[in-house]
UniProtKB/Swiss-Prot annotation:
Superkingdom per UniProt: Bacteria
EC number: 1.2.1.10
NCBIfam families the record matches: ac_ald_DH_ac, PRK08300.1
Binding sites annotated in the UniProt record for NAD(+): 162-170, 273
SMART domains linked to this entry: Semialdhyde_dh (SM00859)
GO biological process: catabolic process
Name of the protein this chain belongs to: Acetaldehyde dehydrogenase 4
Record lineage: Bacteria, Pseudomonadati, Pseudomonadota, Betaproteobacteria, Rhodocyclales
Source species of the chain: Dechloromonas aromatica (strain RCB)
Record flagged with keyword ATP-binding: no
Family under the similarity heading: Belongs to the acetaldehyde dehydrogenase family.
GO molecular function: acetaldehyde dehydrogenase (acetylating) activity; NAD binding
Active site (record annotation): 131 (acyl-thioester intermediate)
UniProt entry keywords in alphabetical sequence: Aromatic hydrocarbons catabolism, NAD, Oxidoreductase
Pfam families: AcetDehyd-dimer
Amino acid sequence: MTQKIKCALIGPGNIGTDLLYKLKRSPFLEPVWMIGIDPESEGLKRAAEMGLKTCATGVDGFLPHVLEDNVQIAFDATSAYVHAENSRKLNALGVLMIDLTPAAIGPFCVPPVNLKEHVGRREMNVNMVTCGGQATIPMVAAVSRVQPVAYGEIVATVSSKSAGPGTRKNIDEFTRTTAGAVEKVGGAKKGKAIIIINPAEPPLVMRDTVHCLTETAPDQAAITESIHAMIKEVQKYVPGYRLVNGPVFDGNRVSVYMEVTGLGDFLPTYAGNLDIMTAAGARTAEMFAEEMIKGTLKLEPVHA
């Protein structure tokens, strides 16, 4: 039995619960705590049934247990508003934060684009952008690694049922954080992000549209090849990531139309937006965990 790094999940909503299912399968990570703020929460009850310790008094109620249970990684799936405080308190105890909110106080991580850059940087907080960011930024990066992109615009459409209260409270943060990461990680000089929450019944699968304006006439063959190579990289951890149409070339505009089907861990397969976020978060944490198990990464407390 290989050693596993113990983890805590903060926020027992759609994202936190879906992530829990994925961590249960991880060869490097062992989820041991689920932290919420409502003792009646379905997510906390479900986590307890799955054998986790639970706490309904927020991060403050969990702090005394961090060191005794040797928790080294925490995933925050709450809300951008509370993430900074959660991170400060846990970083002070030497816990690495994987931020699944749009708070973006740490550097962005989109695994197929820049995961390897985070190795050896000794960061104690990394941000997973947003579900829309994880689904679309690889496509912007696939174009920008071929030639300069003056403008990148992404539209993420998710089903109403998959967007919980935390997601809805963070719409403005979603658009700002995603647009920022389209620039910083995707490589576009200017980025824009739009989210659409679709109430259709039965719920629709996540769909994503990506438009890039290249500075010069697009090299169609090279861009097409780059996009297909990037899709294969994303499919390594999100098998339901699929090209529906494109790349479509119109002058200097390159358009790509994607859909993301989930594994159906917590919500049914239409909720690909949960999968792409939680799988990316788990993949990122596993990379840090592998380093920790090998002994090449030792977490140090950070005092703000």
